């Protein structure tokens, strides 16, 4: 890990118009998956964890877009 990587990860990256479209697609896909989990899985700690991990996945995917894969 380099200082440049750390600096990149902790720097605000203003989204481009293309990024905004990508973020929306990621959120919509994740929302659909989370709804499927909600509909198909019984109420449980595992269901809650599964939906939380979908949310975490979206945040991590958004970070990859913002940081341009760096």
Predicted regions and their residues:
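Short, compact, well-ordered microdomains
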Residues: 46-69
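Intrinsically disordered, low-complexity regulatory regions
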Residues: 1-46, 66-70
């Amino acid at each position: 890990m380099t200082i440049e990587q750390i600096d990149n990860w902790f720097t605000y990256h203003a989204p481009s118009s293309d990024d905004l479209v990508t973020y929306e697609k990621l959120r919509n896909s994740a929302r659909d998956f989370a709804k499927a989990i909600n509909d198909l899985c019984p109420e449980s700690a595992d269901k809650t964890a599964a939906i939380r991990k979908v949310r975490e996945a979206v945040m991590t995917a958004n970070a990859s877009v913002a940081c341009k894969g760096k």
